[in-house]
Amino acid sequence: MNFENYFPLWNDLNIAQKKIISDNLITRDVKKGTIIHNGNLDCTGLLLVKSGQLRTYILSDEGREITLYRLFDMDMCLLSASCIIRSIQFEVTIEAEKDTDLWIIPAEIYKDIMKESAPVANYTNELMATRFSDVMWLIEQIMWKSLDKRVASFLLEETSIEGTNELKITHETIANHLGSHREVITRMLRYFQDEGLVKLSRGKITILDSKRLETLQRS
């Protein structure tokens, strides 16, 4: 499918707006591990995922990563164009978790269209509200939810995303998602293994008892 089939506001644009987007649209194919947007140093533009998977995260003062949210097929990201919205001061990094095909609407192009089009402006505000709701939910998880519950939730989310109970993932990767240390995650996973919830092997975690993980995350 083409860009217009993915962009939810295409039919709300006039002919001139459609042309300026088409003339300036950037298509990128990025490999897993590619940094697409790097904090306030970049004003990349609005991202629209055609296929693949992106991860949006922040860095603590100590250099620890924590995932804010992920982007999948047909998802849009505005934080990569936060320079066009003065009230947003959010230093996020966006990385490809898998090989990804995406489109980029340059920030200034999107800013001009947002000024002209009420539907685009309204949609932008709704999308930003949704993303900040995601971030507030994450803060609540970090503040009030114990690490064992957060690890259980993450493992269950991964099995849903990947469609398998055999996860090819490192302890370091989990630590980066959850804003923790690798050693802490390793101890927690070994505890899970002792309890019969998972089986650990090099670069892989096999989920053995998803029901008990679900019970743990809800407790």
Where in the sequence are the language-model features?
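Cyclic-nucleotide recognition modules
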Residues: 69-125
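Cyclic nucleotide-binding regulatory module and flanking cytosolic helices
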Residues: 1-31, 71, 76, 81-85
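Short alpha-helix-to-loop micro-motif enriched in aromatics/charged/Gly
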Residues: 61-68
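Polybasic "coupling" helices that flank or enter modular domains
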Residues: 97-98, 115-180
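Glycine- and acidic-residue-biased ligand/ion/polar-headgroup-sensing regions
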Residues: 33, 44-57, 72-74
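Short phosphate-coordinating micro-motif centered on Lys-Gly-acidic
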Residues: 36-41
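Phosphate-/nucleic-acid-contacting segments
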Residues: 147, 156-219
